[in-house]
Amino acid sequence: MASKKWPSFSVTKEFILRFNNTDNRVKEEELLEQARKFTVRCKRKLGLKTLGSGKHVHLPTAWAEVIYLAQCKGEIQDEALNMLYASLDHVSFDCDQLPTLFFLAESVLYRLCCDAFKKEYLYSVEIKLVKIGYLIFLRLFVFFLHGHLENFKQHLLRLQPYLYALYYSEPSYYKYPNILSSLQFILKTAEIICKRELHFEVFESLREVEDPFSDTNHVQLNKRGYEVNHLLWHSVAAWSCVQDNRPQLNAVLDHILFHKAQLQTKCWLDSALALLVLGEAAKLNMACLKTLMDLMTHFLLSPQSQEDYCSIYDIPWASDIVFIYTSIIAEVCLYAATSDLRKTALIGFCVCKDPQQDIHLTNKSEEMPELDGASILTLLKYFSSRISDNCAKVIWVGYYGIVYNLVKMSWELQGDEEQDGFRNMVWQTLQKIKDYEEDPRIQNAVTIAQAELNDAADPFSSKAAPNSEAFSKYIGWRIANTLSRLFFPSLDVSALPQKTPVETDLQRKHTISKRQPEKKGVVRIVMKEHPSVLELSMFPYPDFFTKADKKLEEVIDHHWQKDMETLKQIEAVCEAQNRKDEEEKEKIRFQEIMKQRERKLNKQTKPYEITPSEKKE
């Protein structure tokens, strides 16, 4: 029995041309009806109702058809882009997706560079294309961490012209942080991947002066692979502890706060992933939510407390980190497992006052409130009190991100009767912002969010369209799940399914398939040695979960010991420097005493020192 062959692409170039250029009204209705049938067929192949799983799902074919269908004008284009965004958000990671992912990346970049960038105004289709591009490169970066992009050098080279055009288009999106943040993520991802796989800087020729804040200096060009930072590693460990209900969670969260200063370091792509993974854990656990909010609070207050790291008002990616956080905390507000988690993400941990008072915005002439948390309403008051025409980019981008996500939250809550109080509070907050805020950048956030959603109507009037996604609901969970299997692999589960050739004869059951051995050391993680057989023989053989808990505890202890050794070394260096400074001060003080003694007594001897002449007497 031959394997099932999927049909060739239903959407052809001729169909797209006829759909976009027909003037006959009857023919236009026929083509529109045919296009709607294509969308129904694509929805089934994408598995939108089953999170991309099922025998009827064939993602490579469906993704290609949808990106072709997105070239049709009007409602079909919007429907196709919404379907593609939802699919890229929720499907699991599989190596067989890589060729089609690169095809999607090239198609999206081509549409942006050759069509969208040439338009005088910003269109909702352009926003959707950027969001889709962000999800594509986010998935490519996860595959890169697994070491699966070695055979795709030609695909990477094909992206170079579009990446150059994207690089030059960045300044035109300065007023739109939601778009600029995604574009910078795409460019940084491409830069890191190309430096590792192609061994050259993508934008090196475009920089006249070396960027002191470049985040590609930490990329390893040897066989040991890309090295993730401690913040990302421990965030994945925290998510694993929450999923398996392991007792090491508090210790892992302590490690995360120990490495909180890494949010200010150069590898900001790892920091963004760390926030994304920790945000998924925060949807399930209050301690993780508190750690996530503490990280951002420290990040925003770091100029006042950190001397060894650059001020966040000086580093170019700080606004990207802040905007990404506003999206993550908004997702926690909407999709957290309990009402307490959702309420805390919205108003913070303080319960000593009426939540309605948090909606009040601080007047510019009043005393600026201190930052006492990183909930949505706390950040809203903090940013709104500090915004001005010449304020730091971090301030107005953070304010923009809060307002932008509040609009999307109010739209997402349409028709949800169980969350009337929550929706009412979000709506009242937005109304106060519209009445109070006169800054055009913040007013622009409301307009852009409504344009992205294709809806500026009353959020209480109707339910949201089922296929239009305001937030990426599943990609964080997929990434956390995949990275946890990569960082903490079990004996019987692989991090990602291996790409296997298609067999033409399914009846050959006894055929032995030859696979290339997996490459080790993609991510450098130091593990402790296994205990000896003699130690294990004295006790009953532990089950899988006991062994997993023990192994995770050993890994955490190992990293904690390394952190403590590093801290001791730093303290020893500081103590030695302090002793040296004290000795230097004492030496200078003694010299001053001797000068005063010589000036007053005309003697050069030390105090209480007997001269030879005095000895003779």
From Swiss-Prot:
<dbReference type="GO" id="GO:0016020">
    <property type="term" value="C:membrane"/>
</dbReference>
<feature type="transmembrane region" description="Helical">
    <location>
        <begin position="129"/>
        <end position="149"/>
    </location>
</feature>
<dbReference type="GO" id="GO:0030030">
    <property type="term" value="P:cell projection organization"/>
</dbReference>
<comment type="function">
    <text>Plays a critical role for male fertility and sperm motility by regulating sperm cytoplasm removal and maintaining axoneme integrity.</text>
</comment>
<keyword id="KW-0472">Membrane</keyword>
<dbReference type="GO" id="GO:0030317">
    <property type="term" value="P:flagellated sperm motility"/>
</dbReference>
<keyword id="KW-0970">Cilium biogenesis/degradation</keyword>
<dbReference type="GO" id="GO:0098544">
    <property type="term" value="P:maintenance of protein complex location"/>
</dbReference>
<dbReference type="InterPro" id="IPR031747">
    <property type="entry name" value="TMEM232"/>
</dbReference>
<dbReference type="GO" id="GO:0007283">
    <property type="term" value="P:spermatogenesis"/>
</dbReference>
<keyword id="KW-1133">Transmembrane helix</keyword>
<feature type="coiled-coil region">
    <location>
        <begin position="567"/>
        <end position="604"/>
    </location>
</feature>
<dbReference type="GO" id="GO:0160087">
    <property type="term" value="P:spermatid cytoplasm removal during spermiation of flagellated sperm"/>
</dbReference>
<dbReference type="Pfam" id="PF15877">
    <property type="entry name" value="TMEM232"/>
</dbReference>
<protein>
    <recommendedName>
        <fullName>Transmembrane protein 232</fullName>
    </recommendedName>
</protein>
<keyword id="KW-0812">Transmembrane</keyword>
<feature type="region of interest" description="Disordered">
    <location>
        <begin position="598"/>
        <end position="617"/>
    </location>
</feature>
<dbReference type="GO" id="GO:0001520">
    <property type="term" value="C:outer dense fiber"/>
</dbReference>
<keyword id="KW-0175">Coiled coil</keyword>
